[in-house]
Swiss-Prot record:
Family affiliation: Belongs to the UvrC family.
Family matches, as InterPro entries: GIY-YIG_endonuc, GIY-YIG_endonuc_sf, GIY-YIG_UvrC_Cho, Hlx-hairpin-Hlx_DNA-bd_motif, RuvA_2-like, UVR_dom, UVR_dom_sf, UvrABC_protein_C
GO cellular component: cytoplasm; excinuclease repair complex
Function field: The UvrABC repair system catalyzes the recognition and processing of DNA lesions. UvrC both incises the 5' and 3' sides of the lesion. The N-terminal half is responsible for the 3' incision and the C-terminal half is responsible for the 5' incision.
Subunit structure, as described in the record: Interacts with UvrB in an incision complex.
Domain GIY-YIG: start-end pairs: 16-94
Organism encoding this protein: Pseudomonas paraeruginosa (strain DSM 24068 / PA7) (Pseudomonas aeruginosa (strain PA7))
Gene Ontology biological-process entries: nucleotide-excision repair; SOS response
Location in or out of the cell: Cytoplasm
Pfam families referenced in this protein's UniProt entry, alphabetically: GIY-YIG, HHH_5, UVR, UvrC_RNaseH, UvrC_RNaseH_dom
UniProt name for this protein: UvrABC system protein C
Predominant location: cytoplasm
Keyword Zinc attributed: no
Keywords tagged on the record: Cytoplasm, DNA damage, DNA excision, DNA repair, Excision nuclease, SOS response
Length: 608
């Protein structure tokens, strides 16, 4: 355990409720994410004096900070834990090689006869997504039972479009045969509507509707239809949503604001169909004397009015009221075309949701204030190391990433005394320079950044940190001189001969002013943190750009294959690798590809 982390003091304030915890080292690097039925009991087990496994002991000695997020139950803790592990890939977590996200049910919207399917990954296709579900097995069971109940197709689009007679699913009464016109669009749409009602968590309303239909069918002496509806109701009862918050329903956002002399936090929980889909913390900049109601009013206005694409719930549950909420509701109704109800005095499940949001806001703000003091101390140490009159308020760091000159990307990350300012991060796609020329790439990125600054866009940094040593530092000086930018400090950082962390060489303003800092210096830790973040941000941008180029560049050489057809081909075959393996006949079977065009595509893909 590090000297700066007081486990006893932390555990004394830790909650006994379910949740997720995140462990960080002295450089604010995320080490481990875990979940617990009782956060206090689980975290206490890490700090026993004996009996720890070697891996756990190795983790504990590096812990400098622990953050927690309270959840309503263990299932929500599991989903949040998985999300964090996927996003950050902490070194002490077990990382699955396929790194798949939790699955969703996807309902296509572009087809006359929509399809239900299991979906993982980015939500790029047009349609509706329901979930997440805790496992693929759970979602397949639900899809299987939904198919039995409502007979909505689940086959691949390519399979569906090429059928000339019903498949086995029709024979075993799992599908109504829309592929060959055995069911009309109106009847099929009704089956889809029932499926959506179930997936939205409106099982009770759906069961009531089906029960009514069953009674009406029985009165008409249509006992076959009545039996069909009876079976559908029975299936619904078997697959009631296990993730629903008990007693909850509808679409609700729960928003709680907390203000202390050190700052403010707004915690938002999104509930759709009675299921918690996720939550997020926001930390608005506020004056010390700001009232909680004012903070909440400003947040709600910006969140729902400034971002029209955000899903608007039917109701907001808040932890404090404001006299101007009716005005806000009217403004939202006018801008979004939907009525919104704001509730404060709530009972039962809704009161528990409200308290959960308040608790998470308090926990998050407390953790942020502790971390802010940690980062601010590093800024003060940097000011002392550079002999500055006062700590800097804005640091910018640039880095370059490419693969042998391919898909070069420059990154700019920004830090302040409160930590990373991610809304100010920028990436620059580098064009028109010699492949692999990092100096030219840096020149272009800095020129673009500071040209905009000269035009009045953005803020001037106090310190410009350049990764790469003397050469890149000289390039930065050249750009600043060309643009007549003055008043900022240049700091170059170069890895030492051994390239080990802690042995970096620093250059202040010019290559002649060379110095080093002790490996345990908080100022050096801040520089390392910002440099590593710039590298991470650059390499993720580079990989995305390189991947996109490699997926499409080969097909761009084929006459008659434009962007849409390239996209359709890659989607049909599942990627460039599978496309390259396809024969001419297989290519010709793809939508919109003639035999002649298939031959041209095959020739280009196998030209080397």
């Amino acid at each position: 355990m590090t000297a700066v982390f007081d486990a006893s003091a932390f555990l004394a304030t830790c909650s006994n409720r379910p949740g997720v915890y995140r462990m960080f080292d002295a450089d604010a690097k995320l080490l481990y994410v875990g979940k617990a039925k009782s956060l206090k009991k689980r975290l206490a087990s890490y700090f026993r004096k004996s009996g720890l496994a070697p891996k756990t002991a190795a983790l504990v000695v590096r812990i400098a900070q622990v953050e927690t997020t309270i959840t309503a139950n263990e299932t929500e803790a599991l989903l949040l834990e998985q999300t964090l592990i996927k996003e950050w890939r902490p070194p002490y977590n077990i990382l699955l090689r396929d790194d798949k996200s939790y699955p969703f049910v996807f309902l296509s919207s572009e087809d006359e006869y929509p399809r239900l399917s299991l979906h993982r990954g980015a939500k790029k296709r047009k349609g509706r997504y329901f979930g997440p579900y805790p496992s693929a097995g759970a979602i397949r069971e639900s899809l299987n039972l939904l198919q039995k109940a409502f007979l909505v197709r689940q086959c691949e689009d390519s399979y569906f479009r090429n059928r000339t007679r019903p498949c086995l699913q029709y024979q075993i009464k799992r599908c109504k045969g829309p592929c060959v016109g055995l069911v009309g669009p109106e009847e099929y749409a009704e089956d889809v509507r029932h499926s959506v009602m179930f997936l939205e968590g409106r099982s009770n309303a759906l069961a009531d509707e089906l029960n009514t239909g069953m009674e009406q069918a029985a009165m008409r002496l249509d006992f076959e239809k009545a039996a069909e509806l009876r079976d559908q109701v029975a299936i619904l009862r078997r697959v009631q949503d296990q993730q629903s918050m008990e007693g909850g329903n509808g679409d609700v956002d729960i928003v709680a604001a907390i203000v202390t002399p050190g700052g403010a936090c707004v915690h938002l929980i999104s509930v759709r169909g009675g299921r918690v889909l996720g939550s997020k913390n926001f930390f608005p900049q506020v004056a010390i004397e700001e009232e909680v109601g004012e903070v909440l009013l400003a947040f709600l206005g910006q969140y729902y009015l400034s971002h029209q694409e955000r899903d608007l719930p039917a109701e907001l549950i808040v932890n404090v009221m404001h006299e101007d909420f009716p005005v806000l509701v009217a403004a939202i109704a006018e801008a979004r075309g939907r009525q919104l109800e704001i509730s404060y005095r709530v009972r039962g499940t809704r009161a528990r949701w409200q308290q959960l949001a308040v608790t998470n806001a308090e926990q998050a703000l407390g953790a942020r204030l502790a971390n802010r003091q940690h980062v601010a101390a590093r800024f003060e140490a940097l000011a002392e190391a550079l002999d500055l009159a006062e700590p800097p308020q804005r640091l910018e760091c640039f880095d370059i990433s490419h693969s042998s000159g391919e898909a070069t990307v420059a990154s700019c990350v920004v830090f302040g005394p409160e930590g990373p300012l991610k809304s100010d991060y920028r990436r620059y796609n580098i064009e028109g320079v010699t492949a692999g020329d990092d100096y030219a790439a840096m020149h272009q990125a800095l020129t673009r950044r500071f040209s905009r600054l000269k035009e009045g866009e953005g803020k001037m940094p106090d310190i410009l940190l350049v990764d790469g040593g003397k050469g890149q530092l000289a390039m930065a000086q050249e750009v600043l001189q060309e643009l007549a930018v003055a008043g900022l400090i240049l700091l170059g950082v170069a890895k030492g001969v051994t390239r080990k962390p802690g042995l970096e060489t620093l250059y202040l303003n010019d290559a002649a002013h060379e110095f080093t800092l002790p490996a345990d210096s908080p100022a050096l830790h801040l520089i390392q943190q910002i440099r590593d973040e710039a590298h991470r941000f650059a390499i993720t941008g580079h990989r995305a750009r390189r991947g996109k180029a490699r997926r499409t560049s080969t097909l761009e050489d084929v006459p008659g294959v434009g962007p849409k057809r390239r996209r359709d081909l890659l989607k049909h075959f599942g990627g460039l690798q599978e496309l390259s393996r396809a024969s001419i006949d297989e290519l010709a079977k793809a939508p919109g590809i003639s035999k002649k065009l298939a031959e041209q595509i095959y020739a280009v893909l196998h030209s080397e």
